[in-house]
């Protein structure tokens, strides 16, 4: 008999920006952008007040400034964010040992056999959110479902400071009208390819046979087939091994930093394509350089959300170049672009029975 699974995805609300607003009362209620200023800088995070103007994580900082001229830019303090993240994780561990962190601000929890004595997954999620608020003065949203894929979608449903449950008996009804662009892993390019074939919702996807989806979209076709049916058998894995994918290029002639643009763009494309062939998503972007004197230096950046396109990866890599502080006349013999902090893509299974608490039923 298949074990009944109860999975919670907890996502802190505008985490980096919320920490800044918590610690500096003058920032509360104002549009806050967590980013270094500069032509090549990118946005780490944006408060909800800034998001109203269209500011998003991984966006070039100059664009964020154009969209929201009154935004207050705050340089990131990752040591502080990590300390808060550890507080939050300690709360998770009171309820289950099966905690899979995805980044500083989100994690999956398997509460099928909870430690805390609370039986309903919805009550566990509500308790965790209350403890986070009480102990950190921050808010979190939660999704509760029979698997990781659905829990991830559910956590976005009532943001900020809310929770949403998708019980197994409602999975089909929930997914049928869901736009394919709400499915993790379906970006603008894939959305366009699907729309060209008349596929706009998960219900449309269900009309396609597996063999036809695989013929049209290769190995990703199976993921689409499974997602449309709410299928995801991946376990919550507390000890995910960190991996990375990178591409490097050694030049025939040493180049100046300003001459590396084309190489960085090409390498970002190679790294992105290599990542697409795996079932994993990289969160941390790394730029590697080797000088003519064989000195190696790296610059890295972890946005609030993983890069969702080659263009985002490219822009972050180019922004990291601006953080290289060697003399302008320094020449380089090698450049590399990498992605690290990997986790599995969302997708791959069938739900099992789920308890539902009061006031947590899906909206029609």
Curated annotation (Swiss-Prot):
Q: List the molecular function annotations (GO) for this entry.
A: damaged DNA binding; DNA-directed DNA polymerase activity; magnesium ion binding
Q: Where does it primarily localize?
A: cytoplasm
CC annotations in GO = cytosol
| Start and end residues of each UmuC domain | 7-187
Identify the residues that bind Mg(2+): 11, 105
UniProt cross-references to Pfam families, sorted A to Z: IMS (PF00817), IMS_C (PF11799), IMS_HHH_1 (PF21999)
Could you say which cofactors this protein requires? Mg(2+)
Q: Which cysteines are joined by disulfide bonds?
A: none
Query: Its catalytic activity?
Result: DNA(n) + a 2'-deoxyribonucleoside 5'-triphosphate = DNA(n+1) + diphosphate
- Cofactor note from UniProt? Binds 2 magnesium ions per subunit.
Q: Where does this protein reside within or beyond the cell?
A: Cytoplasm
HAMAP family according to UniProt = DNApol_IV
Which family does the similarity line name?
Belongs to the DNA polymerase type-Y family.
Oligomeric and partner information: Monomer.
Name of the protein in question: DNA polymerase IV
Q: What is the lineage of its organism?
A: Bacteria, Pseudomonadati, Pseudomonadota, Gammaproteobacteria, Lysobacterales
């Amino acid at each position: 008999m298949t074990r009944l699974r109860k999975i919670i995805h907890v996502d802190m609300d505008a985490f980096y920006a919320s920490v800044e607003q918590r610690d500096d009362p003058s920032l509360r209620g104002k549009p806050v952008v967590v980013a270094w200023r500069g032509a090549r800088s990118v946005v780490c995070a944006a408060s909800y007040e800034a998001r109203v103007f269209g500011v998003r994580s991984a966006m070039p900082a100059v664009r964020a400034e154009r969209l929201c001229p009154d935004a207050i830019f705050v340089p990131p303090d990752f040591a502080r964010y990590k300390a808060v993240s550890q507080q939050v994780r300690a709360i998770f561990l009171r309820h289950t040992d099966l905690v899979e962190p995805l980044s500083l601000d989100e994690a999956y929890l398997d509460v099928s056999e909870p430690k805390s004595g609370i039986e309903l997954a919805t009550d566990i999620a509500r308790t965790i959110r209350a403890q986070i608020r009480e102990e950190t003065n921050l808010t979190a949203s939660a999704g509760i479902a029979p698997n990781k894929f659905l829990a991830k979608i559910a956590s976005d449903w009532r943001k900020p400071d809310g929770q949403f449950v998708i019980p197994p008996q409602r999975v089909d009804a929930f997914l049928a009208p869901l736009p394919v662009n709400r499915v993790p892993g379906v970006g603008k390019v894939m959305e366009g390819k699907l729309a060209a074939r008349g596929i706009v919702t998960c219900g449309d996807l269900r009309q396609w046979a597996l063999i036809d989806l695989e013929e049209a979209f290769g190995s990703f076709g199976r993921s689409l087939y499974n997602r449309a049916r709410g299928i995801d058998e991946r376990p919550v894995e507390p000890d995910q091994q960190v991996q990375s994918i990178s591409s490097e290029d050694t030049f025939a002639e040493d180049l100046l930093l300003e001459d590396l643009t084309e190489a960085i763009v090409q390498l970002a494309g190679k790294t992105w394509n290599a990542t697409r062939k795996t079932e994993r998503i990289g969160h941390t972007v790394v730029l590697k350089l080797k000088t003519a004197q064989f000195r190696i230096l790296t610059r890295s950046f972890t946005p609030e959300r993983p890069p969702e396109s080659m263009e985002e990866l490219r822009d972050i890599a180019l922004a990291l170049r601006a953080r290289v502080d060697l003399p302008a006349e320094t020449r380089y013999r090698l450049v590399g672009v990498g992605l690290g902090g990997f986790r599995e893509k969302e997708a791959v299974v069938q739900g099992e029975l789920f308890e539902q608490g009061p006031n947590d039923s899906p909206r029609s």
